[in-house]
Amino acid sequence: MSRTIPFLFKLVNRAVILPTAGFTLGVGAFVKAWPDDAGVLSLNDPQTPAELISATKSRQPMELQRVDILAQIEKSEVYNKLAQDEKMHHVLFSEKIPSGHREYHVGQGLLFGKGKLEIDPLVFHDVNHGELTVIYHLGAELGNRDGNVHKGLLSLLLDEALCYCGFPLLPSKRGVTARLSLEFFEDIPVDTTIILKANVKEIKGRKCIIEGHLEQFPLEVSSRNGTRSWNLPHIWGFNHKQEMAKKFAKANCILVEPTWFKYFKWLDMF
């Protein structure tokens, strides 16, 4: 009997007391450290009109970005078509990350800047129809010894974007990745501009299925000024609308909302 009591105390201490105390202290410290502007730009907020007309209006310092790449993108037919689409909510990625936490975010901190993610990703989101387009530029420091972008980074971009695409359609506007399936077709050379396209395929209660892919950014510039850049398929007589963009990878994401998330709707923690 004398040995049983210490054993039970150790069991309760390890299984109940210590985990509860650790969780309580962790949540308390986390919430205290969370910036005051954390809830300013959450997915629960109404869309604000006309945040951006030009990609140069960035929340990230322009000295950390490739201005020449931004200029090329702004002249492209793809960008202008998206920017003029009234269904699309146009923001920069940094606008969705609280300013106090950007430096700790992988894509906005560790992997952002010259030689890395060289522009603040341009986001076009049709929330009602579950469609998302994001434009990135992948710098030279994101490559392996063969000069191709690391697959781990591409996996991160796909996971993050597909979740972002599906979050607004979940009951509590947030969830977790239950499964992410990836398939890579071709390597992406460094110093390449790419487009990520995603769309929600199925939404059922607390479960959401999203598909997406990475493709090459088209080099043709917009014809809004009446001219186009040199493009051999056009010279040879091919219709640019019939050309298929090169796909580098595709992904399928199953997003779920844990039942207990509904109790934290009031807390803009995540």
UniProtKB/Swiss-Prot annotation:
InterPro entries: HotDog_dom_sf, PTE-AB_protein, Thioestr_dom
Presequence boundaries: 1-12
Gene Ontology CC entries for this record: mitochondrial inner membrane; mitochondrion
Pfam family, one: 4HBT
Subcellular localization(s) per the UniProt record: Mitochondrion
Keyword terms of this UniProt record: Mitochondrion, Transit peptide
Binding partners and assembly: Associates with the mitochondrial ribosome.
PANTHER family assigned: MIOREX COMPLEX COMPONENT 3, UPF0644 PROTEIN PB2B4.06
Described function: Component of MIOREX complexes, large expressome-like assemblies of ribosomes with factors involved in all the steps of post-transcriptional gene expression.
Extra information: Present with 704 molecules/cell in log phase SD medium.
Name used for this protein in its record: MIOREX complex component 3
Annotated source species: Saccharomyces cerevisiae (strain ATCC 204508 / S288c)
High-level lineage: Eukaryota, Fungi, Dikarya, Ascomycota, Saccharomycotina
